[in-house]
Amino acid sequence: CALPILHGEDLRSILKVLRGADKSWLIFAALFAVAYLVLQAVSLKIIVQSAGTPMRLKDGIRYTFIGFLFNAITPSASGGQPMQVYYMHEDNISIGVSSVALLFWTIIYKIALLLIEGVVMLFFRGFLHQYLGHYYWLFLVGIGVNLVSIILYSIVVFSRNGVRNLAHVGTWICHKLRIIRHKKRFMEKLDRSLELYQEGAVYMRTHWEVFFIVLAVTVLQRLSFFAVTWFVYLALGQHGVSPWEVIMLQSFVAVCIDILPMPGGVGINEGFFVTMFKQIMNKKTAMSAMLLSRGVNFYILMIIGAFVTLGTGMMKVTGQKERE
């Protein structure tokens, strides 16, 4: 929520700036926000179909909006993928294929961010230090956390026994904490699921061309999300900064905030956004940019996701009644 950040600020001045925003640029911002999830659906479709399972793009778009909604409302964005697996299973995509596809995409999603930041560190180091300042350490921590995540996820996908060992350790811990009471019965179900999972994982390990195609799409997806802020910048009548510089600042926010276990990075994301962007505009305008940017690339997508989830549920209920 942005309310704590607005405490003590001149709300009338901020509202005046918001009312003066150019609506045509905001439409472009919204289109790029939607394109962010559509491109994710394209990646998911490529991965799933490469495993020999048909999937329509419109279904992929539905899964990505549902995933976005549940990521937004759960700590560490942990709820999206389980819900995507559930809805994909409802559409006859096996749990093994959907789980590996989503994990494979997650690895590539993180690699895409590191690839973008790698370009920044190689060619725009001065810009990096100038705008991050004493937050540079947080940027490095974010890069480190993403690297560790990629390594752990890769062990799961590319190691034959990695996922089994991790799952068994997790089961043992849950049993000790009395979360899982019937360990043997749970392990039998887990092993059956892992057999399906490994079938998909073996396929992914041998299809590197899929990796590079999806990586290209995912880099575009990341840039599409970051570009939302550029259109907001234009909507507020700002000038003097290049699109790439605005995109780099937004990418710094992503690296530094993604590591924090808050639902959607709510609160902290807004604060860090203002900290970064008040360096290229006055604080009042930065506050307005934060509200517009967050509204477009988070809350609007959440609302669409809620309608998509509700619509999917209603279609399911209607289908069940027709079969009865």
Q: What are these language model-derived features?
A:
Residues 176-197:
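Short, membrane-interfacial amphipathic segments enriched in basic
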Residues 12-20, 88, 193-205:
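A short amphipathic helical element positioned immediately N-terminal to and/or at the very start
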Residues 1-12, 16, 70-181, 262, ...:
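Transmembrane helix-loop-helix hairpins in multi-pass inner-membrane proteins
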Residues 41-69, 232-249:
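Membrane-embedded helical hairpins/re-entrant loop segments and their flanking transmembrane helices
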Residues 2-53:
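Anchoring transmembrane alpha helix of integral membrane proteins
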Residues 112-114, 193-195, 217-229:
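Core segments of transmembrane alpha-helices
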Residues 29-36, 67-74, 109, 217-221, ...:
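Alpha-helical transmembrane segments of multi-pass integral membrane proteins
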